[in-house]
Amino acid sequence: MKKEIQEGDITTLSFEQALKQLEVIVENLERGDVPLEQSIDIYERGEALKKHCEKLLKVAEAKVEKIQLSQEGSPEGVEPLDAQ
């Protein structure tokens, strides 16, 4: 069963909404029953959704902080979480 692919401005989507749309695109492309021109269009939208998700993850990652502990073990401050 072919699932509907949403259209519209990707930049307004939350991470969860963008990820869900990306999953629908992958399902449709994996089934192989989408015409070539439409496959190209939805692939391009999938790439844009992927970039949007990566951007949102980087923003979230920048907000995550690691708690610094004093020698006694009590919280002393925060520092950015190292990207790994």
From Swiss-Prot:
Which GO-annotated molecular functions does the record name? exodeoxyribonuclease VII activity
Report whether Hydrolase shows up as a keyword of the record.
yes
- Recorded catalytic activity of this chain's protein: Exonucleolytic cleavage in either 5'- to 3'- or 3'- to 5'-direction to yield nucleoside 5'-phosphates
Asked if the keyword Electron transport belongs to this entry, the reply reads no
Q: Which GO terms describe its cellular component?
A: cytosol; exodeoxyribonuclease VII complex
E.C. number(s) listed in UniProt: 3.1.11.6
| Compartments, as annotated in UniProt | Cytoplasm
The residue stretches assigned to a coiled coil in this entry are: none
Alphabetically sorted, this entry's keywords are:
Cytoplasm, Exonuclease, Hydrolase, Nuclease
Q: InterPro entries annotated for this entry? A: Exonuc_VII_S, Exonuc_VII_ssu_sf
Q: What is its main location?
A: cytoplasm
One biological-process term from Gene Ontology? DNA catabolic process
Q: Enzyme group, top EC level?
A: hydrolase
Quaternary structure annotation from Swiss-Prot or TrEMBL = Heterooligomer composed of large and small subunits.
Q: Its family?
A: Belongs to the XseB family.
Function text = Bidirectionally degrades single-stranded DNA into large acid-insoluble oligonucleotides, which are then degraded further into small acid-soluble oligonucleotides.
* NCBIfam families noted in UniProt: PRK00977.1-3, xseB
Q: Which PANTHER family match?
A: EXODEOXYRIBONUCLEASE 7 SMALL SUBUNIT (PTHR34137:SF1)
In Swiss-Prot or TrEMBL terms, this protein is called Exodeoxyribonuclease 7 small subunit
> Which organism is this protein's natural source?
Bartonella tribocorum (strain CIP 105476 / IBS 506)
